[in-house]
Amino acid sequence: MVVGWSLLGWALSWLAVATVVVSAIVTVDKEALTRECDPDTPMVVPNFKANWFKATEYCHYLDRNLVIVTSAEKQEVITKVLEGTDKFGDNSFWVGGSDLAELGNFHWHSTGTRIVWHNWSELVPMPTADDPTRKDDRCVLLSNNTEMGGFKWIVVNCWDEYYFVCEKGVFAK
């Protein structure tokens, strides 16, 4: 009986220590969560990386869509939003464009409209049907580096994980 109680005491002590350690490691940015859930915030950058599909799903969960970029002015607004986050140093963010329905025919997922205005990087070539190494590169990423001269668009594998930008939209609930 004594062994049982001392073993239980030891286990409870370790559980208490583990709880304190985990509590110290896991910090919650309450301000970011508030912004993310605030229906009046026009754009949010969730606090985790995801593949393009999961990012789309999460934005819908927030009654938003992956951001669409329809002009240089809109891209500048997005850039300013990103500069105001702690994610800016990551340099790459999912937006709502892809050519998943037809190779080379890019559309905005949330509206179904063809991408007219664009800001493709000249440094990263577009994938082609005859390049088997890039067959999964179908989703648009807003990527920033000095060689590209600021945020430019590139097409990458939709299953790669990046931060992403959600926005309130006409088609969001």
Curated annotation (Swiss-Prot):
Residues bearing carbohydrate: N119, N144
SUPFAM superfamilies registered for this protein in UniProt: C-type lectin-like
All residue ranges annotated as the C-type lectin domain in the record: 51-167
PROSITE patterns documented for this protein: C_TYPE_LECTIN_2
CDD domains, alphabetized: CLECT
One cellular component (GO) term of this entry: extracellular region
Location(s) in or outside the cell: Secreted
Signal peptide: 1-24
Main location: secreted
Origin: domain of life: Eukaryota
Gene3D superfamilies (UniProt xref): Mannose-Binding Protein A, subunit A
One Gene Ontology MF term: carbohydrate binding
Effect of deleting the gene: (Microbial infection) RNAi-mediated knockdown results in reduced Japanese encephalitis virus infection levels.
Disulfide bonds: C59-C166, C139-C158
Keywords, alphabetical: Disulfide bond, Glycoprotein, Host-virus interaction, Lectin, Secreted, Signal
Function: Carbohydrate-binding protein.
Quaternary state and interactors: Interacts with putative receptor-type tyrosine-protein phosphatase mosPTP-1; the interaction may mediate the recruitment of Japanese encephalitis virus particles in complex with C-type lectin mosGCTL-7 to the cell surface.
Protein's recorded name: C-type lectin mosGCTL-7
